[in-house]
């Protein structure tokens, strides 16, 4: 059974005294442990769709289920990571990671070793006591990722998490995300404008149309894992990137 299933999802909202049709008849599913990415032009509803799946935003029509259950609001088995790290300046890296544990009223003392292990896993061992202003942008995003993983959610939603980073840092974090995903075997929904990033990371890519966002095509990616950066230099990779660019009308 798919861990995520969307059927006929639409979203309309009022903006500037007029109705905005953000999403129209979106249908897709994701299997357990699958890495699924949404790509499309700005304003096509990628982030809106992600928030609907996460229970952060109501849909206007259609059905969304996670583990066979209708999504009626935020769920404890879903972790979230956004484009900016959204860390509290007055909390250390470790304290920021433990924040959702406190919000969920879990035992922070019991989760502390897990938080330390995750920070080590993302390469931040020794920075547990550092504050956000002492960390680079890439390091802050690693803290944000650790925070999303600390209570072991089954599903991870990532909304352009590396969009503000330089290309070198972005590639390093793509490798980190792949490694962590392969170790932890989460289902990931990922939003990006970067087609190469989508192809590198994904099993399945939803290519979306301009507003109102629809699924233009679902593209499957079958490159074996683990994938290395040099994959991006191959003709096969370039061909798939070009195929998606053609679907988007930017080839």
Positions of PLM-derived features:
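Conserved signature/switch motifs of ABC ATPase nucleotide-binding domains
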Residues: 130-133, 151
């Amino acid at each position: 059974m798919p861990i995520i299933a969307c059927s006929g999802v639409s979203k309309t909202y009022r903006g500037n005294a007029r109705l905005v049709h953000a999403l129209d008849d979106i249908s897709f599913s994701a299997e357990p442990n699958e890495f699924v990415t949404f790509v499309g032009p700005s304003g096509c509803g990628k982030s809106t769709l992600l928030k609907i799946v996460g229970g952060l935003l109501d849909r206007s029509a259609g059905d969304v289920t996670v583990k066979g259950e209708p999504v009626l609001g935020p769920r404890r088995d879903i972790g979230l990571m956004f484009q900016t790290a959204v860390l509290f300046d007055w909390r250390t890296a470790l304290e920021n990671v433990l924040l959702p544990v406190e919000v969920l009223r879990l035992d922070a003392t019991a989760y502390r070793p897990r938080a330390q292990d995750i920070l080590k896993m993302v390469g931040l061992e020794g920075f547990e006591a550092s504050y956000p202003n002492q960390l680079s942008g890439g390091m802050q995003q690693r803290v944000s990722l650790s925070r999303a993983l600390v209570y072991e959610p089954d599903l991870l939603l990532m909304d352009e998490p590396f969009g503000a980073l330089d290309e070198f840092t972005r590639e390093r974090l793509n490798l980190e995300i792949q490694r962590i995903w392969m170790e932890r075997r989460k289902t990931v929904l990922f939003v990006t404008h970067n087609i190469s990033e989508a192809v590198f990371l994904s099993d399945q890519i939803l290519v979306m149309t301009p507003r109102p966002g629809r699924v233009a095509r679902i593209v499957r990616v079958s490159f074996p894992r683990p994938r290395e950066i040099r994959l991006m230099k191959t003709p096969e990779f370039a061909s798939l990137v070009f195929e998606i660019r053609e679907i988007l009308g930017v080839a």
